């Protein structure tokens, strides 16, 4: 039943959604759940060398019933700054139940976003990290997905909110494009298909990301693309199937269009209907639009436009079916199949764009020409 409902939504047209019911506001996410953070200095065993080392800045969840923690995080080097604080790399520790040397180093890594409560209070009107935590916990229900960033632990103390996540060691996909200039089509397809799997998971959960971009795709050590940054996402409304009211994705019905909202996201990637902010929009369609822009940049090495507005001559050319002509003028031609896919995903009218299911069965996506698994850039970086 759930799979049938997903397929119906993944193939639904804008017209289908207009007939599903009146536009609605996004649904709220559930309340974020947090554990109590305990920060200690302790002895740690290196199981490879047998050495004991006293280390500082070990964080774990303090359970009310005082049962032993499941794991701990040895917080290490700074990876980057973020709006509310800093992101750091962590080493996962295993509890040994030994009073003298209570922890043991493992090969596991994590990243922690350390957010100041003071900063959260000051800037919550701009961006709400509590909502991002709620969304990530919602997305992670039922287990981690390989192509969407999930949550390991969410802890707090008097000063900080601590969001622990899987560690991605190879930077973001935008860095790969910058290094390469542009991708050969087999490499672009390799990444694009993984991004589509991430979108599929979000759609199955009834979530619109709203900020899809190459900068928001991290790459792990196994060359897996992971969608990150759910700070702007929306929980899509669905028809309740009975009274004409609004339900969530679990209703197994068609989703509704969403009432206009203030535009957000990175300018290159925002769809024209969201930029205008005058008419209802389809949450899934705007993510697919941004994904098409991502594919364009991977294949061409440049963004298609600054803003998807009539005033931009590049947008006007693509909107009128001239994508291939524009690329010939740039001396950046791509295959006819790739151009066909992009042209059909980047139609100005959302009623004419491809659905997720149509994108997945497009001949360019299904092409079996293959290609080598891409290599990471020469430096390691985690960007969240």
Annotated model-derived regions:
Residues 149, 158-166, 174-175:
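A conserved loop-to-beta-strand element in the N-lobe of protein kinase catalytic cores
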Residues 347-352, 356-372:
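Terminal C-lobe "cap" of eukaryotic-type protein kinase domains
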Residues 86-119:
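Glycine-rich ATP phosphate-binding loop
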């Amino acid at each position: 039943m759930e799979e049938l409902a997903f397929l119906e939504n993944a193939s639904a047209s804008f017209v289908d959604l207009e007939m599903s019911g009146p536009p609605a506001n996004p649904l709220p996410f559930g309340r974020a759940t947090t554990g109590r953070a305990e920060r200690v200095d302790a002895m740690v065993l290196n199981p490879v060398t047998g050495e004991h080392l006293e280390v500082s800045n070990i964080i774990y969840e303090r359970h009310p019933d005082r049962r032993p923690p499941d794991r701990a995080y040895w917080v290490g080097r700074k990876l980057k700054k973020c709006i509310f604080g800093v992101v750091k790399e962590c080493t996962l520790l295993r509890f040994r139940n030994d009073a003298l040397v209570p922890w043991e180093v493992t090969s596991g890594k994590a990243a922690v976003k350390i957010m100041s409560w003071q900063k959260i209070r000051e800037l919550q009107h701009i961006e709400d990290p509590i909502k991002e935590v709620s969304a990530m916990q919602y997305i992670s229900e039922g287990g981690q997905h390989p192509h969407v960033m999930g949550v390991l632990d969410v802890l707090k103390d008097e000063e900080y909110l601590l969001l622990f996540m899987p560690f991605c060691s190879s930077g973001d996909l935008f860095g790969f494009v910058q290094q390469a200039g542009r991708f050969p089509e087999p490499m672009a397809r390799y990444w694009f298909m993984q991004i589509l799997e991430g979108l599929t998971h979000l759609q199955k959960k009834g979530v619109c990301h709203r900020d899809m971009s190459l900068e928001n795709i991290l790459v792990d050590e196994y060359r897996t693309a992971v969608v990150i940054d759910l700070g702007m996402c929306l929980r899509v409304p669905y028809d309740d199937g009975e009274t004409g009211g609004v339900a969530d994705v679990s209703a197994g019905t068609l989703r509704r269009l969403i009432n206009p909202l203030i535009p957000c996201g990175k300018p290159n990637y925002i769809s024209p209907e969201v930029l205008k902010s005058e008419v209802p929009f389809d949450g899934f369609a705007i993510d697919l639009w941004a994904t098409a822009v991502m594919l364009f940049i991977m294949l061409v090495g440049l963004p298609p436009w600054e803003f998807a507005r009539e005033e931009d001559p590049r947008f006007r050319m693509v909107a009128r079916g001239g994508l291939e002509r524009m690329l010939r003028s740039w001396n950046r031609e791509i295959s006819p199949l790739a151009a066909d896919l992009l042209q059909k995903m980047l139609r100005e009218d959302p009623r004419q764009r491809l659905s997720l299911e149509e994108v997945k069965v497009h001949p360019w996506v299904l092409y079996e020409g293959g290609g080598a698994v891409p290599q990471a850039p020469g430096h390691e970086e985690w960007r969240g």
